[in-house]
Amino acid sequence: MLNKIINREDLSYEESYDLFNDLLNESEIKIGAYLSALQTKGFTANEIAGFAKAMRDNAIAIDLGKGISDTCGTGGDGYSTINISTAVSIILSCFTKVAKHGNVSITSKSGSANVLDALNIKKDCNPEEAKKMIDKTNFVFLFAPNYHPALKKIMPVRKELGIKTIFNILGPLANPANPDYQIMGVNSLDLVEKVGDALKLLGVKKALVVYGNGLDELNPNDYSTICEINENEENKIYKIHPKDIGLTPSNPIPCNSPDESAKRIIKIFSGTINEDRDFILLNAAAALYASNIAKDYKEGLKLAKEVIDNGTVLKKLKEIQKYGE
């Protein structure tokens, strides 16, 4: 199969699934060769989905029920902003169950796991604890290294290679809770359609894949490109601007640490009105739409504003924090 990839021939979904399983038992040299060859060829939706399904199937089993949402993005956009996906996941948990799958930061100064630590939110739940936490609070964080022990052999090779590989985009697609709804940020335009097609193959009910013209979130100051996935429908690609849903464009404020990110999220949840609020609201509106809570982005914005302004989301944050004490 390595020669096939080197010859720039695409793998089928089934071949990709089998290759992932084979890599778990290969030598480090072979793993490095396959990952490098795939990266050079460029991967397809079938290859992404095949790897992601195999990664899910090799994960620690967890059953959190149906109707779960996730807000994980690829990261790696090179910008240091507050952790939008974490803030959005807490807002979303005011309406539905959220199992946020994530890891410590690779390029950002405030990755999800880092910010959850700063917020004093429990992040090391085993499957039994995760079920109890999500049933009690509507929120749980699934720390990726705890749920993907099969990757222990592959991770050092990725680090040694020092290049981007298919694994850079697999994390958000490999949530072991198999979410029905998802908003997923990607860090390049060419991934929007591919990842959308991969999510369709993975059987998601509804999802949005977003690229914010340089950001792996919806951009608060520019157009964002979106792939909308609905089961039993063709995927749709379109652009959206903050003004389209009634927000004034604003530049995201840089963030220097997880602690700063946590403090700024709490400020917004406490009623502070500034650029951070608009950035969070824009992405929360999309998440509520992606999770079938809101009928469109404008209704999503209205709902997100309401739970911030009436104190519901701050109360939810305290409830989630208290659970881990």
Swiss-Prot record:
Anthranilate 2 binds at R158. GO terms for molecular function: anthranilate phosphoribosyltransferase activity; magnesium ion binding. Its EC number is 2.4.2.18. The keyword Amino-acid biosynthesis applies. Pathway: Amino-acid biosynthesis; L-tryptophan biosynthesis; L-tryptophan from chorismate: step 2/5. One of its GO terms (cellular component) is cytosol. 5-phospho-alpha-D-ribose 1-diphosphate binds at residues 73, 76-77, 81, 83-86, 100-108, 112. It is an enzyme of class 2 (transferase). Binds 2 magnesium ions per monomer. Its cofactor is Mg(2+). Keywords: Amino-acid biosynthesis, Aromatic amino acid biosynthesis, Glycosyltransferase, Magnesium, Metal-binding, Transferase, Tryptophan biosynthesis. Anthranilate 1 binds at G73, N103. Gene3D superfamilies: Nucleoside phosphorylase/phosphoribosyltransferase catalytic domain, Transferase, Pyrimidine Nucleoside Phosphorylase, Chain C. The keyword RNA-binding does not apply. Belongs to the anthranilate phosphoribosyltransferase family. Homodimer. This is Anthranilate phosphoribosyltransferase. It comes from Methanococcus aeolicus (strain ATCC BAA-1280 / DSM 17508 / OCM 812 / Nankai-3). The gene is trpD.
